[in-house]
Design a protein with these regions (language model features):
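Helix-loop boundary and gating motifs at the non-cytosolic
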Residues: 1-58
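Hydrophobic core of transmembrane alpha-helices in multi-pass small-molecule transporters
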Residues: 19, 88, 100-117
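Transmembrane alpha-helix termini and helix-breaking/packing motifs in multi-pass membrane transporters
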Residues: 30-39, 95, 152-173
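Helix-to-loop junctions at the C-terminal end of transmembrane segments
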Residues: 59-73, 161
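Cytoplasmic membrane-interface "Motif A"-like loop-to-helix N-cap segments
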Residues: 70-83
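C-terminal ends and interior cores of transmembrane alpha-helices
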Residues: 83-98
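Cytoplasmic helix-loop-helix junction between adjacent transmembrane helices
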Residues: 107-148
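Helix-loop junctions on the cytosolic side of multi-pass membrane transporters
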Residues: 128-129, 175-190
């Protein structure tokens, strides 16, 4: 049985949000890598942006997990953190070519601190959506969103960058993360 809804709307909404956020996340790193190189002509810029975003995400996990566990409304915290992550990605995009690399790395580090909302923060909400035997099925489907995003995100980044430019690829990644916000906000209904 699905949580409080017998038709599975909660799980479908959860999975749609997870897929969008994770595709945007998996797209953001390669898009920033491509942007750094496209704008500066130096491969080190792109790889530095990717490294900064990634390292901060790993460091931010325990911090975000503790906040989420203590939150009275984890759905709202998750939604706000998704918005902050998307805005951080956009800020990096806007600063590339305008600021020196140390400043770019600092912005990417700050943005990356919000990355755990897309991964563990989202998955931690699954028991709010499904319970009992459906939790196993929901967990398997949730895991599939990681796999699908890890395949689609980089390909989408390359396709958008080749078609419209690297800046557009970064903005598309941020838009995908933002598309997940309504799903995150709706988690309190289940």
């Amino acid at each position: 049985m699905f949580s409080r809804y017998t038709d599975g709307r909660g799980l479908r909404r959860y999975l749609a949000g997870a897929a969008a956020a994770r595709a945007g996340d998996e797209m953001s790193g390669p898009a920033l890598l491509l942007l750094g190189f496209a704008v500066t002509g130096r491969p080190g810029t792109g790889s530095g942006l990717l490294a900064s975003l990634t390292v901060a995400g790993a460091a931010g996990g325990p911090w975000f997990g503790a906040l989420l566990d203590r939150s009275r409304r984890p759905d709202r915290l998750l939604a706000r953190t998704l918005v902050a992550y998307a805005l951080g990605i956009v800020a990096v995009q806007a600063a590339v070519g305008r600021l020196p690399m140390p400043a770019l790395a600092a912005i990417a580090l700050l943005a990356g601190l919000f990355n755990p909302a897309v991964t563990g923060g989202w998955t931690a909400q699954l028991p709010r959506v499904v319970t009992g035997r459906e939790l196993d099925r929901g967990s398997a489907l949730d895991a599939l969103t990681f796999s699908a995003a890890s395949l689609a995100g980089p390909a989408l980044a390359a396709g958008v960058a080749a078609g419209v430019g690297a800046r557009a690829a970064v903005l598309t990644a941020a838009a995908l993360v933002t598309l997940a916000v309504p799903s995150a906000c709706s988690l309190s209904r289940y």
